[in-house]
């Protein structure tokens, strides 16, 4: 089984308000079921963490770099307040592959070139993910994705990691201002 280049941590979000809770925090629209690529920002619009969000029938899985899992859990718990949500780490293998998307797997939302992701057991070939990621200019947390940078500087728009039509989220005002100041009128 091929696994991502770096270990991944999984957070499970449950509760009746799970979608609305995360929708108000992250850069991408996660209102539909499936796999989404998104980020959490500071109120000043700077990068904190990028991750995948898998919206399922009864819960949401957050697939984040293993090194960011504790800080992301802490930050999300801080925002939880009275929301009817529970956030907890869970064990779930993350597998990736290329070629046709197998049953139970999801196309990588950043670009088709990165293949698919599956949560749970899934057979796949051994792949040099680092070479593939570099060839397709996909930034990696801890390498090219650095804290206190703006996500538009790190190409999140090209990677389908930000939705300019979804409405408010933490840091949205800064991101929108940067986007619209760089467009020709």
Name each region found by the language model.
Residues 1-185:
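Basic, glycine/lysine-rich polyanion-binding surfaces/domains
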